[in-house]
Amino acid sequence: VKYLLGHTVKSAALMMAILLGGCDQKHDDAHHIKVGVINGAEQDVAEVAKKVAKEKYGLEVELVGFSGSLLPNDPTAHGDLDANVFQHRPFLEQDNKAKGTTLVAVANTFVFPMAGYSRKIKQVSELKDGDTIAIPNDPTNLGRALLLLQKEKLITLRANTGLLPTAVDIIANPKRLKIMEMEGAQLPRVLDDAQVTVAIISTTYLQQTGLNPVRDSVFIEDKQSPYVNIIVTREENKDAANVRDFIKSYQSPEVATAAETIFNGGAVPGW
């Protein structure tokens, strides 16, 4: 699942105050933790972790749901939340840099894998010289798609381009593949385009297709992906007992099984 840095809205401070209203009391004991999550499917997964935490570790998990442009990093940094679960490392690094915060990743959760899909081929070896591959055009996902193509040995990227390479960083393209950049939401539609052999699509836009990343993809990210989602907290809180117990609860068989169902196979455990 992809989250990019959102723009600040004028009412953000007021809305945040309302959202966290009644949550001003700090809970520093080992038996309570307040965790920010994104409303919807991700909160459904966190509810399972909450149940595991109570039953196995006697830990009371208080979930605070977020949506729209309001994300959990600011209240985590300010101490209103103990931790959050919603982002991958590249997002956290970008957010820390932009805001001057020092939040840290303490555990992996799931990879919501980007993958290549096709209605014309079944495996990478069937790609022909000059075939067209459609990829997202926003910087984070464009870079992610190019790194996936490199993992499949279809292209080579210039060294030291990090997680945000662009098409100009391609230094080898043995099959002379044509890279077509477009808005992520449009990618599922080009699967039926006669000119496009493969479309690289994030799970964000899969719901309309009925595709399953593990079952239906030609190639896919694995759990070693740098885009694995993470549990995040403050530096001084990373070894706290409540954080450790929450990590164990989230990285449990019960949560993995629930995520498999909730995301229809679109969540790969990253631990």
Report the location of each language-model feature.
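C-terminal motif of bacterial Sec signal peptides marking the signal peptidase cleavage site
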Residues: 19-22
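Bacterial lipoprotein signal-peptidase II cleavage site
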Residues: 24-32
